[in-house]
C-alpha cells in the first residue's frame, strides 16, 4: 500500500544520515539500508533477467531488484535514500516507485519497511531541488540545526575532551548558526554559506 515518504532536508553535516542508524537501534530486527543515490546508476536498482521456461516455450525477460533492497529477505527494512535530490533522473524515477508504491521491479517491499529520503537544503546551491512530479511523492520536512546546548550535552555524555566542549560553549552560537540567518558570510566563518563559494 502507499505510504508517506518524508524528504528530510537540512544543512550539511547535521546528522541526516545518522537518523537511519538511530532508527536501526530502535528497531533492531530491521535491516538498515543506506542508498548513496548520488553515486547510483539505474542498474543499481534493478536489472533485466531472462527467464527460460522449463516447458521449452519462448524465453522472456523480467526485471529483478538489486539485493541491497532486501526484498528477497522478506524482512522489514529501514531504507534511507541519501542525497536523493542529487541522483540521476533515471535512478530517481526508479526510486519514486520505492517511495510511493513500496515496490521495486514489480516486487513489494515488506509492509513494515520504513522509507525516507535525505537531502541538503535547496538554498545551499548544491543542486538539491525537488522536481514537480517528485512533489507528489515526497513530503519535505526541514531539519533544524542543533543548538550549542544540545551538542555540548551530547558531547559531555560521550566523553568529549573538555577543551572541545569549552570551544563549543564559547563559539557555539556561531558554529551552529543556520546559513540563512547570516546576511553576509564574512560575519561568520564557521557554517557553510552559498555566498562563500559563488
Each language-model region and where it sits:
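C-terminal regulatory/interaction module of P-loop NTP-utilizing enzymes
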Residues: 1-32, 36-79, 84-198
Amino acid at each position: 500500500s502507499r505510504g508517506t515518504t518524508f524528504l528530510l532536508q537540512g544543512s550539511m553535516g547535521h546528522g541526516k544520515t545518522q537518523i537511519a542508524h538511530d532508527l536501526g537501534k530502535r528497531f533492531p530486527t530491521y535491516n538498515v539500508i543506506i542508498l548513496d543515490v548520488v553515486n547510483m546508476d539505474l542498474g543499481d536498482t534493478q536489472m533485466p533477467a531472462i527467464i527460460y521456461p522449463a516447458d521449452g516455450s519462448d524465453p522472456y525477460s523480467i526485471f529483478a531488484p538489486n539485493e541491497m533492497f532486501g526484498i528477497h529477505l522478506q524482512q522489514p527494512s529501514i531504507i534511507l535514500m541519501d542525497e536523493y535530490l542529487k541522483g540521476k533522473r533515471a535512478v530517481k524515477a526508479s526510486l519514486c516507485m520505492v517511495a510511493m508504491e513500496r515496490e521495486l521491479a514489480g516486487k513489494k517491499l515488506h509492509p513494515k519497511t520504513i522509507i525516507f529520503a535525505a537531502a541538503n537544503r535547496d538554498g545551499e546551491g548544491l543542486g538539491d531541488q525537488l522536481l514537480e512530479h517528485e512533489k507528489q511523492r515526497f513530503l519535505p520536512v526541514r531539519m533544524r540545526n542543533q543548538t550549542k546546548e544540545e551538542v555540548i550535552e551530547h558531547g559531555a555524555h560521550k566523553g568529549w575532551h573538555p577543551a572541545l566542549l569549552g570551544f563549543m560553549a564559547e563559539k557555539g552560537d556561531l558554529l551552529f548558526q543556520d546559513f540563512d540567518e547570516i546576511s553576509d558570510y564574512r560575519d561568520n566563518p564557521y557554517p557553510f554559506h552559498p555566498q562563500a563559494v559563488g
